[in-house]
Amino acid sequence: ESTTVRFAMQLGYAGYPEFQRALEEMVMNRLNSVQRMQFTYGRVPQGEILETVLQSDIEKIKMTLEEVDRSAFERAADTILSARTIYIVGIRSCAPLASFLAFYFHMIFPDVRQVQTNSSSEIFEQMIRITEDDVVIGISFPRYSMRTMKALEFANSRKAKVITITDSVHSPMNVYAACKAGR
């Protein structure tokens, strides 16, 4: 059991109970995704697909509003506003989200860099000058990108601030996050 506790702590959890809750939540989220797909495919009458999808989105937005840690959100906003350079990392299915965020941040901030990559070495080449005055925004959802994790680890090692956009407070992406809930 002590090996399991050490493993959980090595992953960034306070202990085994927190790790267990995160695993349970991840399994629930995946099952819910499968269930939602099964429900939508062939079970929603043709004329109600749009309404069903939009209603689902409305419910998710309401849940986010209820669950978001507002102080963590404010810290993230302040961190972005005070950063010298903003790096945005989103790989594979998260690349369009990173591109969207970078596009609009370019209109507001003087130095925004979308880290585009096919390999871990490219990430480090694009982030080589990152310092404690900078921020990295990492975007990843299940199945979490190891390259994004490596980018956040590298940024953290260089004392840059890390902000994550992910699916859960228990996401492994939050290991290096500077703006965690409750902190």
Predicted regions and their residues:
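Glycine-rich phosphate-binding loops that contact phosphosugars or nucleotide phosphates
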Residues: 78-183
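Glycine-rich beta-alpha loop segments
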Residues: 60, 69-84
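HTH-adjacent hinge/linker in prokaryotic transcriptional regulators
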Residues: 3-71
